[in-house]
């Protein structure tokens, strides 16, 4: 007598599709003649196993040049640094607040070499640095040099210009040239032949020197104008062809081109006891000689490397 077989699953929760059930089960007949079903075991790898995941291989560095290897190393360091600083906004803010202030060179086209320059209110800087003026922000000395505060951090390779003091320091802190006091110690301070007065360090406006030269003599003395023959050479030729010639020599009663006359400081223009005095570079041209006071000198760049001493008797 034939009997029919019924395939029954013992796990009711796993029954979904009858076709899947028949596909994943098999008939097992034991020694006692009982028939039972067993589910097929999956021999595949587990989806979360580490062995199944392929490890990312690093690119081979063999055959690359030294320059490429160094460049790649720098790029990797930058990537690691960028990844370490992402999300750390507090540290970035603290770094930006305590940023190092470095000397910023001024445009040499605006500030002439060898001339004390004023940039803004009560900001006077020492001239004569080859590529422009040295400017550091925190504190400005009243005598034309800059002074950095104690909280400012600077690189060890950059010099630290301190406050200029004629009585305590005998060298210029910007160009490190030895200074010397000429005549009256309270009036003229010189460095390598060039001199300037402590009381007259306000330069003419930056929008043009020729307009300043056309002002009256009293106004020039009150503003503390310091004449430099190099500025005269760089000025426009049209200034000498105007109706009021600023290059009029009081001693010889002659007028001449801007290269023929220089000037020197005498006395203290603040109280009206002195000012700019002119003299000729070529006194024999007009048949008269102009005496020059020995203790004063023509003002040239205080820190300029190519300083010309014009304090000789002509």
Swiss-Prot record:
Coiled coil: none annotated. It comes from Arabidopsis thaliana (Mouse-ear cress). Expressed in flower buds. Not found in leaves, siliques and stems. Detected in rosette leaves, stem tissue and seedlings. Residues 1-20, 33-62 are annotated as: Disordered. It holds the Pfam family NOZZLE. Homodimer and heterodimer with SPEARs. Interacts in vitro with YAB1, YAB3 and YAB4. Interacts (via EAR motif) with TPL, TPR1, TPR2, TPR3 and TPR4. Interacts with SPEAR1, SPEAR2, SPEAR3, SPEAR4, TCP1, TCP6, TCP8, TCP9, TCP11, TCP15, TCP20, TCP21 and TCP23. Interacts with TCP2, TCP3, TCP4, TCP5, TCP10, TCP13, TCP17 and TCP24. Contains 1 EAR motif required for the interaction with TPL and TPRs. Induction: Up-regulated by the transcription factor AGAMOUS. Regulated by ATXR3/SDG2 via chromatin methylation. Triggered by TGA9 and TGA10 in anthers. This is Protein SPOROCYTELESS.
């Amino acid at each position: 007598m034939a009997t029919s077989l019924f395939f029954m699953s013992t796990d009711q929760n796993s029954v979904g599709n009858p076709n899947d059930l028949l596909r994943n089960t098999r008939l097992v007949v034991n020694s006692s003649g009982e028939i039972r079903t067993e589910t097929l075991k999956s021999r595949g790898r587990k989806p979360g196993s580490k062995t199944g995941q392929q490890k990312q291989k690093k690119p081979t560095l063999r055959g690359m040049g030294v320059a490429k290897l160094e460049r790649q190393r720098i790029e990797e360091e930058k990537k690691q640094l960028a990844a370490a600083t992402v999300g750390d906004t507090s540290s970035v803010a603290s770094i930006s607040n305590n940023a190092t202030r470095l000397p910023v060179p001024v445009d040499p086209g605006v500030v002439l070499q060898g001339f004390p320059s004023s940039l803004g209110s009560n900001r006077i800087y020492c001239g004569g640095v080859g590529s422009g003026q040295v400017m550091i922000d925190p504190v400005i000395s009243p005598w034309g040099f800059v002074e950095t505060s104690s909280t400012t951090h600077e690189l060890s390779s950059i010099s630290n210009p301190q406050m200029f003091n004629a009585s305590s320091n005998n060298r210029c802190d910007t160009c490190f040239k030895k200074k010397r006091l000429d005549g009256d110690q309270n009036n003229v301070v010189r460095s390598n032949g060039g001199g300037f007065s402590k009381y007259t360090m306000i330069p003419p406006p930056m929008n043009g020197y020729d307009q300043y030269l056309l002002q009256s003599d009293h106004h020039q003395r009150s503003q503390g104008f310091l004449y430099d023959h190099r500025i005269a050479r760089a000025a426009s030729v049209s200034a000498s062809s105007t109706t009021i010639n600023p290059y009029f020599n009081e001693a010889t009663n002659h007028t001449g081109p801007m290269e023929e006359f220089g000037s020197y400081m005498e006395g203290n223009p603040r109280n009206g006891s002195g000012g700019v005095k002119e003299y000729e570079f070529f006194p024999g041209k007009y048949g008269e000689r102009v005496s020059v006071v020995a203790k004063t000198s023509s003002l040239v760049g205080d820190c300029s490397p190519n300083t010309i001493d014009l304090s000789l008797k002509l």
